[in-house]
Amino acid sequence: MMNLLIEGKILSKFKKARSIALVGTGGNLAIAQHMASDMYRHTGKFCFAPDSVNLTALGGDGDWKSKWLDYARGGADLIIAITCRVESPLTRQLVNLDNVILFAPDYHDTIPTIRIESTYYHEF
């Protein structure tokens, strides 16, 4: 069961946010894109995620995640990251940010996390 303090912190961050950036890598990027659309439709909050055009433009410059996160920090009140590994390269880039929620199979030590329990992670 999720810690109530963390659960309250996650809910508070979401309620306060006017704009939300979602990010993931691989299959989680597709989930982030779909989730951004659904979140906008159900909440009316401005939600966005990188798409293949962004990745093509940023990908040639090496680590696209850093560049995209810089962009997201400037345009979003909240960043939601989706990952299969709680200690992924993406997660390490988010550790020092206050406005982050993580979706992952396990809880992160410092980032408020919504734990996705499933046998096959991409089937939630």
Please provide the spans of the model-predicted regions.
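A short, well-structured juxtamembrane/interface segment
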Residues: 2-17
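Glycine-rich phosphate-binding loops that contact phosphosugars or nucleotide phosphates
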Residues: 21, 25-124
